[in-house]
């Protein structure tokens, strides 16, 4: 189970795997990372970059397939992810079961939280504690 939190907003999604996607604010290219929920950690399992550019170095060992760089992240398992939500750039998307949704849409009231935070709210993704959901 994946928990999302921002300020007083909480949501739980019945997911054991998901893709986090976003568009680079300068280069306008899509990034995608596949994650698995494993116990109390998030494990990065694969990633794709649809181009390169400023601050977007292609990792060693990446393979180019149909114009997309594919690689396996070397990042260790994480207890959670902190993502900045701003109305000034395209937001993150959470994809599962072949469907993508804006991450902020999964937390109704996110626009108000972002406004109260001066346009720079944080969304936390982490495994839900076992037996506990918001």
Predicted feature residues:
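Short N-terminal edge-element motif at the start of the domain
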Residues: 1-7
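Generic detector of intrinsically disordered, low-complexity, polar/charged segments
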Residues: 4, 50-52, 64, 95
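N-terminal secretory signal peptides
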Residues: 7-59
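Mature, soluble, non-transmembrane domains
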Residues: 58-134
